[in-house]
Amino acid sequence: MNNDYLVKKKPMYALFVFALPIIIGNIFQQTYTMADSAIVGRFVSEKALAAVGASYSLTNIFICVAIGGGIGASVIVSRYFGAKEYKKTKTAVYTALIAFTALSVLLGIIGLVFSRLILILLNTPSDVLDLAVDYLNIYFAGLPFLFMYNVLSAMFNALGKSKIPLYFLIFSSVFNVALDLLLVKNFRMGVTGVAWATLIAQGISVVLSFIVLVWEFKKLNIGRAKFFEKSELLPMAKIAFPSIIQQSTVSIGMMLVQSVVNGFGSEALAGYSAAIRVESLCIVPFNSINNAVSSYTAQNLGAKNEKRVVEGYHAANILVAAFSILLILLIEPFNGLIVSMFLGDDGTITAMNTGCGYLSFMGWFFCFIGFKMAVDGLLRGAGDMKMFTVANFVNLFIRVFVAMAFAPIFGLQMVWIAVPIGWFSNWVISFLEYRTGKWKRIYKR
């Protein structure tokens, strides 16, 4: 594996080359979740779209646990790999896979038991509750596939092989959309058809990804290594838990804020659901830069090159600025067309106004989450997790407080006004921590 470009090539080039396959892969992943919503909205009903939307923020939390856990484990793997300790690399990878698979089974069982209760507590409109429960139960049954897929992808990224999960994701995405159309349009399975299509597609990706991972290790000629090492769990958990918090902050905020949106009825929920699907796609470049900066920082600190870490952070901010400008140019003129792709020609006025209003406002503020993600990636890669975690909790608190306190008084618009305020606050706290230079000393310890 000749993947030392993260510690040798120019920072801008290294980050872009590393992040690009992740961006493309995540775009495909978000595209097929968007396709789920669009197919349900067009071929079933607006209420079916609202049901999937009612489940979305909750399912996103589990996705974030999987992604955050994978990122946390990948920092440890990246350090071993950057230091050329390949046996420890292999052991750390398998330990992460075993630990997070066990966690996914436990969470899946809990989800199946409490899915209806959770949706009721989130104030889900009664006319879409049963549909949302059906969708969630199938989702929870497939949770191990979701966790395995995301952790495997993170392991490939840590090894500098970010193109491998991309290939499987492209296949899985195309297969998922085809199954969506077959099960929803032809077999009339409604929201359950969408859930089954996702489960099957992710299962295939997991099997293929694991086979290739084993093959990649054989190419390294590592020899025998332990498949599970308990001593690796604590350092992984120390980084994984704050990473999960960081990844979940947005989704937990979305879930609590959605409970406010739910109170405005299923039509507003349908429009909001369409908008946040698009928002998730817009955030993909920044999440990918976050992952790239994290691995870049970990590998360069492992190679004892602090100067390159700072150079990489500056390069990441330039990438964030470029993507932010691109998003403004794409979203602002076309938000009505984008929302109508989900709602169809017979979408209600309330749904259209809600979706368009959200996107039109948010398009100007994606730079805030981008700059936040860049500095968060550096802090996490260096293992500086304390203030990192505090910043993300502040983000969550502000978003939820502003939405829940002011939306019932001033209207639904307060829901989206709360979002950039939280992002900006998070960035300020994380950036000030970066400027102190504590991350250098923490890594050395």
Q: For each predicted feature, which ranges?
A:
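Helix-terminus/linker motif at the lipid-water interface of multi-pass membrane proteins
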Residues: T31-L49, L119-S126, L182-M189, S248-R277, ...
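N-terminal transmembrane alpha-helices
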Residues: L6-F43, N60-G72, I76, T101-G108, ...
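Hydrophobic transmembrane alpha-helices of multi-pass small-molecule transporters
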Residues: I61-C64, N176-D180, V206-F210, L281-V284, ...
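Transmembrane helical elements of multi-pass membrane transporters/channels
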Residues: V17-D36, I138, S172, A201-S205, ...
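Short runs within selected transmembrane alpha-helices of multi-pass transporters and secretion channels
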Residues: G70, Y139-N157, P165-S173, V194-V207, ...
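Small-residue-rich hydrophobic transmembrane alpha-helices
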Residues: L49-I109, L146-P165, G271-L329, P333-N335, ...
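Small-residue hotspots at the loop-to-helix junctions and early N-terminal turns
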Residues: E46-S57, A132, L136, A195, ...
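Short alpha-helical transmembrane segments in multi-pass integral membrane proteins
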Residues: M1-A19, V77-G142, N186-F241, T297-W364, ...
